[in-house]
UniProtKB/Swiss-Prot annotation:
NCBIfam families: PRK00685.1. The lineage of its organism: Archaea, Thermoproteota, Thermoprotei, Thermoproteales, Thermoproteaceae. SUPFAM superfamilies: Metallo-hydrolase/oxidoreductase (SSF56281). One of its GO terms (molecular function) is hydrolase activity. Belongs to the UPF0173 family. It holds the Pfam family Lactamase_B_2. It comes from the Archaea. InterPro entries: Metallo-B-lactamas, RibonucZ/Hydroxyglut_hydro, UPF0173, UPF0173_UPF0282_UlaG_hydrolase. It comes from Pyrobaculum aerophilum (strain ATCC 51768 / DSM 7523 / JCM 9630 / CIP 104966 / NBRC 100827 / IM2). This is UPF0173 metal-dependent hydrolase PAE2160. Disulfide bonds: none annotated. Keywords: Hydrolase. HAMAP family: UPF0173. The keyword Cytoplasm does not apply.
Length: 225
């Protein structure tokens, strides 16, 4: 399994024959890639945690070009249908639900403490034969992260640290502890001035409370698990 970061909250998780694109704001200021680069990579699924612009990004354009289905809350899939995505090309779900993609890959939708234009904000757990990834979406710290860790045995947690709109480094370090994740990648920071953070501060805080290994990625980097 490998995880590529495009900056902000945008990732591609590749495992087996699946290429799972998450929150594809590929035109974000930190991204070294273009939407066309991502189209050329042929994602098999597009997963959206909520419908704010910095998470929806170019999802609709990428879906139209690749025919990859969009996975999100029921309300979010209605929203993309209004933008020209056929209903058959959507995979609606809701918090607490599971979608099985085949080859042992399962998607679980988790809660997130945030807002959305339509529907509820969410996170995703991607469980695969090669490991389990948790993308928290935009969220504050919440106690049930401990339950998420107990249920899903997290190998890699992708956590926002930008503060202002999400949890910051202190809270994200506690989230790492609650999740009992083996590895953690900070995201959703330094994209614009309001969410400027030092990832090394986050790393130090994690190391003080957890055995998790922190991977501070640069946009374009790939983490192999």
């Amino acid at each position: 399994m490998q995880i590529k970061w495009f900056g902000h909250a945008a990732f591609m998780v590749e495992v087996g024959g699946a290429r799972l694109l998450i929150d594809p704001w590929i035109s974000n200021p930190l991204s070294p890639a273009t939407p066309q680069d991502v189209i050329n990579a042929r994602p098999t699924h597009i997963m959206i945690t909520h419908d704010h612009f910095d998470h929806m990004g170019e999802a609709v354009d990428i879906a139209k070009a690749t025919k990859a289905p969009i996975v999100g809350t029921f309300e979010l899939t209605l929203e993309v249908a209004e933008k020209g995505i056929p209903e058959a090309q959507t995979m609606p779900m809701n918090i607490g639900g599971t979608i099985k993609l085949g080859d042992g890959i399962e998607l679980y939708m988790t809660p997130a403490l945030h807002t959305a234009n339509r529907g509820a904000p969410s996170g995703f757990v991607i469980a695969t034969p090669e490991g389990t990834v948790y993308h928290a979406g935009d969220t504050a710290l919440f106690r049930d992260m401990e339950l998420i860790g107990e249920l899903y045995d997290i190998d890699v947690a992708l956590l926002p640290i930008g503060s202002v709109f999400t949890m910051g480094p202190r809270e994200a370090a506690i989230a790492t502890q609650l999740l009992r994740a083996r590895r953690v990648v900070p995201m959703h920071y330094n994209t614009f001035p309001l969410i400027k953070q030092d990832p090394e501060d986050f790393k130090a805080r994690v190391e003080a409370v957890s055995r998790a290994k922190v991977f501070v990625m640069k946009p374009g980097d790939v983490l192999k698990v």
